[in-house]
Amino acid sequence: MERHQHLLSEYQQILTLSEQMLVLATEGNWDALVDLEMTYLKAVESTANITISSCSSLMLQDLLREKLRAILDNEIEIKRLLQLRLDRLSDLVGQSTKQQAVNNTYGQFPDHALLLGETQ
């Protein structure tokens, strides 16, 4: 029974961490999300070392199934939010590259040639 409590506690910790990560992703707090992800991954690794086959209780399996479903739902939403962020960053890099090309092209001319109304 103690083993079952420990396993349930491990899954609850993962669920709590995934909920915190989802909040951070929703808020766009990417640095804190990355920091928390290390703790999350360690918790997942620790839980993976506990064998689920040792849970013979159907009630415990149902509880774990619910937690796993919620964890996976959070993972899907976090990935969606991260993809949106990646797309936004990609757009910004594209705009920056275009701006740099424009600056490089027009930077070749003397400053006075760019002023309107001046004759050369």
From Swiss-Prot:
Alphabetic keyword roster: Bacterial flagellum biogenesis, Chaperone, Cytoplasm, Repressor, Transcription, Transcription regulation
Any single Gene Ontology cellular-component annotation: cytosol
Region (Required for homodimerization): 1-50
Location(s) in or outside the cell: Cytoplasm, Cytosol
Region annotated FliD binding, chain positions: 60-98
InterPro entries associated with the record: FliT
Tree of life domain: Bacteria
Keyword Ribonucleoprotein among record annotations: no
One example of a Gene Ontology biological process annotation: protein folding
Family per similarity comment: Belongs to the FliT family.
Primary role: Dual-function protein that regulates the transcription of class 2 flagellar operons and that also acts as an export chaperone for the filament-capping protein FliD. As a transcriptional regulator, acts as an anti-FlhDC factor; it directly binds FlhC, thus inhibiting the binding of the FlhC/FlhD complex to class 2 promoters, resulting in decreased expression of class 2 flagellar operons. As a chaperone, effects FliD transition to the membrane by preventing its premature polymerization, and by directing it to the export apparatus.
Quaternary state and interactors: Homodimer. Interacts with FliD and FlhC.
Protein name: Flagellar protein FliT
Source organism phylogeny: Bacteria, Pseudomonadati, Pseudomonadota, Gammaproteobacteria, Enterobacterales
